[in-house]
């Protein structure tokens, strides 16, 4: 009996654990502190800083099953998903990694043992082929002489992409930085499937399938293209879980493995589909994986960046559901079946199931409305069309803005004997792809990044003042031996009380000083295991090896500590008041305010905000002890400690507890007891994205200051109303009622004046071919009164065409009215458009009534003068 996908995942991890590898959990799909990458798309992403020498781990071997998304940016598989055997938006990458530990020999031997040993995957050796980089004789000889693969199944691949080192078998992180040759392992499905071995003209067939890529990072590529050997060569490997599952389960398509068969059946059930071979079922089964895990990792549908990619995937899935005949929202119903089929890899998703389902349902409902708006826009564009072809830009705008598939656009056009410029659509699509490619991938010059080999010991939990030694200095990213007065720099110390920005808490400010120098610290950041003090040397000079006294700005740190502790209390209070679906999606803690983003699908009610505020202040009055304990990550999770969104954790973590009320993983600085916070006040609650709310709050002196400010405002209002704070509401109600009465009286007077003006105007109408034409610019008339005047004039004049204009604050307001018996010859929308164009504006409306605005008041007299000639031509 073949292994299930879940069993294959576990077997891979178990094998490498038996070889001394640390099993590391999958990182978030949102790359941590990496603006160069749209989504996590490979197992090595979370170890990138380790490979670059910017970070150190307490292990030199690691293995993972990493969740990955490739949709948008350089790795955009979206269009092919569902229509090929192996394209996915979401996949799991099995990997083993060596950070300066073992190299080619062990990496190849490990791979061969796992794949062919009867104890593990037991693949037939004769079905395995390998490729190596053309000049990598070492890897070639290991495969041939040690593993024993015949020469005819070892293929050398050269620079097959048009440039030196541009090869399928040479991996590069970017234009500069770590790189090296790779060896790939292929599985031969047999001669009943078309295709040739790698490097042959038939290599794109499905017979020979790459299952494992083993990268040997042994060079550091310089800006001039030269390759310098790395002092500690490393290994990075990747094997797609879905691909190896297909091989081990004896199927040719990833969509035929147990995981996808189960999901496809679930899709068929919720959509009512009966043909299990329909490609749309595969599309939806793939897309629920990427969408659900992206939302669980904090991405929300939006019109930009990661949220935009998520929205496109959701809409593609929903459209395919509609093609299958789904009559109601269905996509969110697949989250439960997905959790079931993912096994242990779905635990994070299970904790957020309700939130993920709600976001998907809301987005699907919104798309239904978007589809209607897209159809309306298409109708407008077709109405304006003069030829028989809809331009590609418009078709692309319908697709890009409204999620409108081009084939649906073509169907609507076909009914009206109109073609779609599909070549123009493809050109616009390719331009978008080009922009996406430029905006993604490892494009940075990593040799310009700060590399610190030393580590800094943080002692800021217990000290705000400490003596240390300068271990490194950096100016403009480059290491220097000394700096002089006036220079901006990053100073690294062997030990420091300064907290480096992390977990939402900003870095400390303060001063580094000595007998003859003073360095003002404006920020503190992490550089791998080192802590960098960023600022400017105010006086003297400073060199590597100097002793310094590090003084943190104590008052600022104290305010930050209160805000950070209050953030933890508020998080726990939100979960009590709103529900356990609340999870942190981001935070900012500085000395002035705390900002907290969390999952919740609607605006908080005033009574909910008050309840959270009251609950936090109750815990402050309890004066609970705030305690920290260092423990294993798994033990902390078992204790119920909540983790911060987007934060990386070591195997040993710091657990912060506030009595029995809150327990979270946190490396930040905090008050000693909750009572130190003094007072907590929420100052705003707003939405940042679908399903994400944001609270801003203040504590301590900041909270007291808001109380004083509110009191002063109330006193000022009371003084203006000649009352006091006790009867202020009654006074305001009285003033509002009097204001409403006066506004009503004023409106009546305006309407009377407009009626009188209309009566005066009617006498100015002229006859044009039996139709009364009235064109007039009015002064002192509000734009909103023009419509009333046109209605009055229509009643007075009978068969008529009316154009009225007024200018207020430099802006032109126009209205055109046409009696219904004339609309077959003159349409108000066309007339107003002609006038508006001359005054720098645009507008539209019904055939009998249309409005417009403009910005060029000086051009108004000439524009109005042109009406008579235009109307005369229409009435001939």
UniProtKB/Swiss-Prot annotation:
Alphabetical UniProt keywords: Acetylation, Aminoacyl-tRNA synthetase, ATP-binding, Cytoplasm, Ligase, Metal-binding, Nucleotide-binding, Protein biosynthesis, RNA-binding, tRNA-binding, Zinc
Cofactor note: Binds 1 zinc ion per subunit.
Top-level taxonomic group: Bacteria
Top EC class, one word: ligase
Modification N6-acetyllysine, positions: 74
CDD domains given in the database record: AlaRS_core (cd00673)
InterPro entries xrefs: aa-tRNA-synth_II/BPL/LPL (IPR045864), Ala-tRNA-lgiase_IIc (IPR002318), Ala-tRNA-ligase_IIc_anticod-bd (IPR018162), Ala-tRNA-synth_IIc_core (IPR018165), Ala-tRNA-synth_IIc_N (IPR018164), Ala-tRNA_ligase (IPR050058), Ala_tRNA_ligase_euk/bac (IPR023033), DHHA1_dom (IPR003156)
Cofactor(s) of this protein: Zn(2+)
Record localization: Cytoplasm
GO biological process: alanyl-tRNA aminoacylation; negative regulation of DNA-templated transcription
Entry's EC annotation: 6.1.1.7
Keyword Zinc belongs to the record: yes
GO MF annotation terms: alanine-tRNA ligase activity; aminoacyl-tRNA deacylase activity; ATP binding; tRNA binding; zinc ion binding
Catalytic function, reaction form: tRNA(Ala) + L-alanine + ATP = L-alanyl-tRNA(Ala) + AMP + diphosphate
Domain comment in the entry: Consists of three domains; the N-terminal catalytic domain, the editing domain and the C-terminal C-Ala domain. The editing domain removes incorrectly charged amino acids, while the C-Ala domain, along with tRNA(Ala), serves as a bridge to cooperatively bring together the editing and aminoacylation centers thus stimulating deacylation of misacylated tRNAs.
Homology family: Belongs to the class-II aminoacyl-tRNA synthetase family.
Role noted for this protein: Catalyzes the attachment of alanine to tRNA(Ala) in a two-step reaction: alanine is first activated by ATP to form Ala-AMP and then transferred to the acceptor end of tRNA(Ala). Also edits incorrectly charged Ser-tRNA(Ala) and Gly-tRNA(Ala) via its editing domain.
Protein name (database record): Alanine--tRNA ligase
Natural source organism: Escherichia coli O6:K15:H31 (strain 536 / UPEC)
GN (gene name): alaS
